[in-house]
Amino acid sequence: MKNNKEMRVGMLLNYLSMALEGIIIFAFNPFIIRELGQENYGVYSLMNSFTGYLSVFEFGLGTTIIRYISKYNEEKNDTTKESFLSIIFGIYFLIALLIIIVCVILYFSLNNIFSGSLSLEQIKLAKRLFIIISASITLTTIGSVFSAIISGYEKFIFSRSVVLVTTLLNALLTLGVLIISPTAELLSMITLVVSFTSI
């Protein structure tokens, strides 16, 4: 009964986070475009989309972690669970290392990739954003293993509450940047800061 209640509340918090995120994007995007300008916003969006593909390196392992942690907890098999977690941490370390290597290669290829579509100044901005966003994705990938483990222990309320809090934190920081100093670099830094605090 307790687990069912945990799941229901967790699901409710998850839907709330998704709805809030959609509202924030819908509300903030016009202001971000206005403050950054069409060209800088274009580079900002391009780098977010371009680096977004790096998240595929996670290979959907989160679902596997949740399933096996739940299984070993139900069986009270702590020895196997600890061995499994050791392997998972090793895999995620290699994934993070792979992301960093790919990011370094892509960084030095940005001139060739975008020379035909972006100006020199835009490429410089793209490189700065690429470093920040790549660091965010690396941290998010590392953090996802802890989120999956927490869900595996069926602490759905806690894990979804963390997502909700980070969504609110992201919104507040974005609002602050838009008011004080709206730049593409600072907007990207918000994701990095939130990724770091959520680990």
Give residue ranges: language-model regions:
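Membrane-interface junctions at transmembrane-helix termini in multi-pass inner-membrane proteins
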Residues: 4-8, 137-165, 175, 185
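Alpha-helical transmembrane segments of multi-pass membrane transport and lipid-handling proteins
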Residues: 89-115, 172-179
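Alpha-helical transmembrane segments of multi-pass membrane proteins
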Residues: 105-108, 118-143, 160, 188-189, ...
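Small-residue-rich midsections of specific transmembrane alpha-helices
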Residues: 22, 45-73, 93, 99, ...
